Amino acid sequence: MGFLSDHPHTAITETIFRIVSSRDYTLEVELAPLIQLIKADHNDYNYTVNQEEAARALRKKIKYGNRLQQSRTLDLLDLFISQGVKFTVMYNDDKLLQRLRGMATNSENSGSGEKYEPRIIKKCAAYAISWLNYITQNNLENARAYSGLYQLGQTVKQRYSKSSRSRRSGGGSGGRSNFMDDSADDTLYQSNSLTSADRLYRIPQINMNKEAPRIRLIISDALASAVSLQNSLIGLPKGKFSTDDEEATSKFIQARAIRRKVLRYLQLVTEGEFLGSLIHANDELVAALTAYDDRSAQDDSSDESDHGSYDDGIYDENEQDNSRYIDSESSEEESLSSYQPSTISNPFGDHNKI
């Protein structure tokens, strides 16, 4: 703790800052030691203070961090929640929730005063909806630990649903999503050890020892997401379009995002124990996404309408139409990685790459 600091700054903050700032650390591996740090003091007061410190560290990296730090901080928070860790104080921290809400709805700028990157906005919104689904699926709506996250998810989902209905009534494109045109998530694995030549020529490299836990988790999430989407479609009333059902649509968005991660690992994993499982996971996701498309509303609009831009008040990318993204941590290397903006505001368009 600094001499003039009003807030504690212990190993908890140092650990969070370290593991979200570099891809050299596998979050799934670092999670357990971090949980132990937060739970180290069994005294109720210290336990509360530790959670407050963790929430503050997460918020700082979301607010002031570069894109890598923001992305990995969201991933770390998702791991806490998805693994069933009940940190009541951390999950209900008002400032953290406000920052997440502002990011997910694109209503607040980063600490530098600039707009958040579209990919970060999409990621935060997708996580907020997935946390809401996790809470409802496990009947945790009345659990005090998740009350803040539940309200956050509802807010994001309502904003998305409102913009989606507005597009349908205002002539936005409907019909099939063309999800098979989705590209792999090229932000999922970009090792800091890659040379400029590696980045320029897109040479696939992966450290299986570090990535194995993450691959297992993604395979598990992919299969669970496919089943969840299929189940939501089975429960649709006869004659109701999948695109008109909020639950089915949110599960479709999740499944599509996870499939992009699976596709990325299929580019990197060419042999070994995970290859067959990744192929199977992709097949299951494709089947579920296709089933959603088969139940979607069709219209007579031309294919070109899928390429239109939308102003939905949530994902305003007009100011973010960059042809490439330069990471503030390593601008020379990151400038070699192209950035292609997408239109999350139209979850059924060709350019939607969650």
Curated annotation (Swiss-Prot):
GO terms for cellular component: actin cortical patch; cell cortex; cytoplasm; cytosol. Residues 15-161 form the VHS domain. It comes from Saccharomyces cerevisiae (strain ATCC 204508 / S288c). Essential for the organization of the actin cytoskeleton, fluid phase endocytosis and vesicle trafficking, together with YSC84. It is found in: Cytoplasm, Cell cortex; Cytoplasm, Cytoskeleton. It comes from the Eukaryota. Belongs to the LSB5 family. Residues 296-310 have a biased composition (Basic and acidic residues). The keyword Cytoplasm applies. SUPFAM superfamilies: ENTH/VHS domain, GAT-like domain. InterPro entries: ENTH_VHS (IPR008942), GAT_LSB5 (IPR044103), LSB5 (IPR045007). Keywords: Cytoplasm, Cytoskeleton, Endocytosis. This is LAS seventeen-binding protein 5. One of its GO terms (biological process) is actin cytoskeleton organization. Interacts with SLA1 and LAS17. Residues 160-184, 296-354 are annotated as: Disordered.
